[in-house]
């Protein structure tokens, strides 16, 4: 069988969040671990791959932090202004993609991405016409409560349930079409894969790692610091 080459890819990092859940005046993507911000760690994990030739960072209109970072001057990096939701911001990024068949979307506050996981995502997804995502099987017991209460209604069957992560890698034209349709119809999409699902397309799930965490609350910073220290020792 002939090997199929990994195509050139454009990366999009939605980074228009304002840090409300962190209860901080500083948006969480600019919190630091070591000598780098979370967004720099996340971008570096992507930009070290030769197949990623362009990285579009989508920021808030009032963001004055990103351009203070040295990585913002990397010739591969472009900056655009995002919207009110993640989907709006990703769509804003898609409008600035140039001549790329594939687009990879990664959370700006998910700094602990392993090189091996990224390569596995590339290797498996390149044979797909749609795309795929990193995810991990749900291992904890999941409870559903009655609406508006904290009373347990039932236990959710964990079989075939996965916790979606990023990066998520998709065919550019297909992602743009599906996201545009979802936004037009005011469908809530919490990640890129859900836009594809809405339009009836089947994405691939690629087994990721539980340490690929999204930093949402203050306590997550300590955990990310621990995971990153282990990751850098390994490399």
Swiss-Prot record:
The record marks 158, 214 as: Positions MEP for the nucleophilic attack. The keyword Transferase applies. The record marks 21, 28 as: Transition state stabilizer. It catalyses: 2-C-methyl-D-erythritol 4-phosphate + CTP + H(+) = 4-CDP-2-C-methyl-D-erythritol + diphosphate. Keywords: Isoprene biosynthesis, Nucleotidyltransferase, Transferase. Pathway: Isoprenoid biosynthesis; isopentenyl diphosphate biosynthesis via DXP pathway; isopentenyl diphosphate from 1-deoxy-D-xylulose 5-phosphate: step 2/6. GO terms for biological process: isopentenyl diphosphate biosynthetic process, methylerythritol 4-phosphate pathway. Catalyzes the formation of 4-diphosphocytidyl-2-C-methyl-D-erythritol from CTP and 2-C-methyl-D-erythritol 4-phosphate (MEP). Belongs to the IspD/TarI cytidylyltransferase family. IspD subfamily. This is 2-C-methyl-D-erythritol 4-phosphate cytidylyltransferase. It comes from Blochmanniella pennsylvanica (strain BPEN). The lineage of its organism: Bacteria, Pseudomonadati, Pseudomonadota, Gammaproteobacteria, Enterobacterales.
């Amino acid at each position: 069988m002939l090997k199929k080459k990994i195509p050139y890819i454009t990366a999009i990092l939605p980074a228009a969040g304002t840090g409300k859940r962190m209860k901080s005046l500083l948006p969480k993507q600019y919190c630091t671990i070591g000598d780098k911000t979370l967004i720099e760690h996340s971008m570096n994990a992507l930009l070290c791959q030769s197949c990623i030739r362009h990285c579009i960072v989508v920021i808030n209109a009032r963001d004055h932090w990103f351009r203070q970072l040295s990585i913002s001057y990397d010739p591969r990096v472009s900056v655009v202004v995002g919207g009110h939701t993640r989907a709006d911001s990703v769509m804003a990024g898609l409008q600035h993609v140039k001549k790329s068949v594939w687009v990879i979307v990664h959370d700006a506050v998910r700094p602990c991405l392993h090189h091996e996981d990224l390569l596995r995502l590339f290797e498996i997804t390149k044979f797909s016409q749609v795309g795929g995502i990193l995810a991990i099987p749900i291992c904890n017991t999941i409870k559903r409560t009655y609406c508006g209460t904290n009373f347990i209604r039932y236990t959710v069957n964990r079989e075939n349930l996965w916790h979606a992560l990023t990066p998520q890698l998709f065919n550019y034209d297909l992602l743009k079409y599906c996201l545009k349709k979802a936004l037009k119809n005011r469908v809530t999409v919490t990640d890129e894969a859900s836009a594809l699902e809405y339009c009836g397309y089947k994405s691939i799930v690629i087994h990721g790692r539980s340490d690929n965490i999204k930093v949402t609350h203050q306590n997550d910073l300590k955990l990310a610091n621990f995971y990153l220290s282990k990751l850098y020792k390994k490399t």
